[in-house]
């Protein structure tokens, strides 16, 4: 009986995405993406930019791994509003930088309009609220069903707009890299099933 158990092939874990962020808005958005893509995504919130380090990321990855073959991809979703956070993110070499400058609201704005000129976080939120009716009552940390619908339906438009911007500069958002990885993983999963 024991011999049979040892001969079973080891189970291969699905790819896991770890997303490090510090705010409720980012957490809400990533949880929404998890529902849409139906992929294993773990959001690690409230890791402030000052506390972010390669050592901390490595410890989270190690805790998630069941076997050496597990594929765990980590992402850093932060607002690039200070030089200190830029330095911290740059030092974390094993993770994919999906930061937005000045804030995640720029990513939301790119779903409805282009943004090529420098913009502050407050101006970005104000422009987002004026962009379309569903964003008029936008509050950080909350996404309404209509806002989620826009974010889902226009994600490819936002990605195309974000790709035209210079990464790390104001304005820029690299959140499209997370969506690209999720799209690839979903396609691979569907190909294996199909």
Can you say where each PLM-predicted feature lies in the sequence?
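Helix N-cap/beta->alpha junction signal
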Residues: 22-23
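C-terminal accessory helical subdomains adjacent to catalytic cores in phosphodiester-
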Residues: 2-16, 27, 31-47, 60-75, ...
């Amino acid at each position: 009986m024991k011999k049979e158990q040892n001969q079973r092939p080891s189970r291969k874990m699905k790819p896991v995405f770890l997303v490090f962020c510090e705010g409720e808005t980012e957490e809400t958005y990533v949880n929404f993406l998890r529902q849409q893509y139906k992929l294993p995504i773990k959001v690690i919130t409230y890791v402030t930019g000052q506390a972010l380090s390669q050592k901390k990321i490595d410890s989270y990855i190690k805790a998630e791994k069941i076997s050496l073959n597990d594929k765990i991809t980590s992402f850093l979703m932060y607002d690039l509003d200070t030089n200190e956070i830029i330095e911290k993110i740059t030092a974390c070499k094993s993770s994919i930088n999906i930061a937005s400058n000045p804030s995640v609201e720029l990513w939301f704005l790119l779903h409805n309009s282009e943004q090529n000129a420098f913009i502050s976080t407050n101006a970005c939120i104000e422009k987002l609220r004026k962009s379309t009716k569903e964003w008029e009552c936008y509050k950080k940390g909350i996404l309404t069903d209509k806002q989620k619908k826009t974010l889902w339906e226009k994600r490819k438009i936002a990605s195309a707009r974000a790709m035209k911007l210079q990464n790390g500069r104001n304005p820029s958002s690299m959140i499209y890299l997370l969506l690209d990885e999720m799209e690839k993983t979903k396609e691979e999963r569907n190909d294996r099933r199909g």
